[in-house]
Design a protein with these regions (language model features):
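Hydrophobic structural segments
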Residues: 1-126
Length: 126
């Protein structure tokens, strides 16, 4: 299976989604949140980076998840309990996490709102 450099994908997503131009919530972090070993052979997408979605992505053979709701939202607390399980699953599966919250909401072509407008066949949405 061919592999692609993780940083090449990150650069592409950062540029396409204008990660550095969109101001998000104070503690939200858009972009690469967790690195893997540096190579990507399959990408999974999910709304949330949860233990369930990470395990499902790993079961599908993915080692990069692109998510709308990433891991970092609030000032961080200790990674114990469920958070420990989540980080363990990421490491054991060499899974990278890339998150785009408001950049994905606002994107005129790839964004969630753009997709919804297209699905509803809305003409000239504002």
């Amino acid at each position: 299976m061919p592999k692609v450099d993780l940083q090449a994908i990150v650069k592409h997503c950062d540029r396409e989604l204008r990660i550095n131009e969109i101001v998000d919530y104070e503690d939200a972090h858009n972009g690469l949140q967790v690195e893997n070993g540096g190579k990507v052979h399959r990408i999974a997408a999910a709304v949330d980076a949860s233990l369930a979605t990470i395990c499902k992505a790993a079961d599908m053979g993915a080692n990069l998840m692109i998510v709308h709701h990433g891991l970092f939202w609030n000032p961080q607390h200790p990674w114990t309990g469920k958070k420990h399980d989540l980080i363990t699953a990421l490491i054991e599966n060499d899974m990278a996490i890339y998150s785009a919250h408001l950049p994905l909401d606002l994107h005129p072509r790839h964004g969630n709102n753009a997709g919804l407008c297209k699905a509803l066949k809305l003409k000239r949405p504002k």
